């Protein structure tokens, strides 16, 4: 449990893990500093060069925050008990992007994923980081709209062929048209 207020500490090193935290802490009722926890606004620097800036609670990232990984990947959004959870945006160093809902550090719920400078776009449902449910996938002018399972066209769907202008509507199995369709 926390105390009656917060104090700001500018230089605190977590020797065990080599992390450095600057920010707000609780003041425990008994004034034993070793029982205080990060609570409020803070900055955490990791030994690999990664950096978190944002809200903390019970010594975990909690609330709105931004994690910049040492490789240049960035997540900005909501955190719950140390994990990306809620609404957020992830951008990797190649320019790929995901914007949408998160749960337990994974894409989960409704979202949009874009690759190759926006030339490939998926908009739809995600479950535990995988494209699963209903969605739309656009690439090279072609488009698939329908059911996805684990990132593949699987179930009922419609495929628009950009070059011929033809449309296949019917069943799909593991990214392939299955049956006659129409």
PLM regions with names:
Residues 1-182:
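Intrinsically disordered, low-complexity repeat tracts enriched in Gly/Pro/Ser/Thr and acidic residues
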């Amino acid at each position: 449990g926390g105390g009656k207020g917060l104090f700001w500490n500018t230089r605190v090193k977590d020797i065990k893990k080599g992390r450095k935290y600057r920010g707000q802490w609780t003041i425990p009722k008994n004034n034993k500093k070793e029982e205080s926890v990060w609570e409020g606004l803070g900055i955490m620097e990791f030994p690999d060069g990664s950096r978190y800036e944002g809200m903390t609670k019970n010594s975990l990232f909690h609330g709105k925050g931004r994690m910049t990984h040492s490789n240049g990947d960035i997540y900005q959004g909501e955190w719950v008990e140390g994990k990306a959870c809620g609404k957020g945006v992830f951008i990797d160093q190649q320019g790929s992007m995901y914007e949408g809902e998160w749960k337990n550090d994974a894409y989960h719920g409704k979202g949009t994923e874009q690759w190759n400078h926006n030339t490939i776009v998926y908009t739809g449902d995600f479950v535990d980081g995988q494209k699963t449910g209903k969605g739309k996938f656009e690439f090279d002018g072609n488009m698939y709209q329908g059911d996805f399972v684990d990132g593949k066209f699987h179930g009922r769907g419609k495929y628009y062929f950009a070059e011929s202008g033809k449309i296949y509507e019917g069943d799909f199995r593991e990214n392939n048209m299955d049956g006659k369709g129409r």
